[in-house]
From Swiss-Prot:
Organism whose genome encodes this protein: Homo sapiens
Annotated metabolic or biological route of this protein: Purine metabolism; AMP biosynthesis via salvage pathway; AMP from adenine: step 1/1
Signal peptide range in chain numbering: none
Lineage, highest ranks first: Eukaryota, Metazoa, Chordata, Craniata, Vertebrata
Purpose: Catalyzes a salvage reaction resulting in the formation of AMP, that is energically less costly than de novo synthesis.
Root EC class: transferase
Name used for this protein in its record: Adenine phosphoribosyltransferase
Amino acid sequence: MADSELQLVEQRIRSFPDFPTPGVVFRDISPVLKDPASFRAAIGLLARHLKATHGGRIDYIAGLDSRGFLFGPSLAQELGLGCVLIRKRGKLPGPTLWASYSLEYGKAELEIQKDALEPGQRVVVVDDLLATGGTMNAACELLGRLQAEVLECVSLVELTSLKGREKLAPVPFFSLLQYE
């Protein structure tokens, strides 16, 4: 069953060469979201991985702005957990913590509400895609500053040639699909 589900998800990923710049192949997850069966398969595969790896040890899923918001709450619901949001800076009310990270051309910032988690709570970070690892690494930094334990980071797609997984170490990382 898992192989056919993974194939269903993989068949929905579209590739757009030279977008947004020459030499880049953009991996478009929009068709996965459009097709209920492939979206359900993606959530199911991620949930089964997390159950097998962590059992009942996970307290929360942390979804990253913005496409992690599409997968995070659905994954949390599938696992019977709550979901906390890690947003681009300036989007959350109340007291927040923030962290900067590097992009290909400049910097960006993420934030989380200071009361989003209690010290010692165990979290899995989810996003749609791992490229350089900057966003997930900043999220892990923020969660660490809240004294949460990051059990793992997961994504639908991983761009292996950008070595983002290495930036996350020692936090384990899992992806459903890998592309160069």
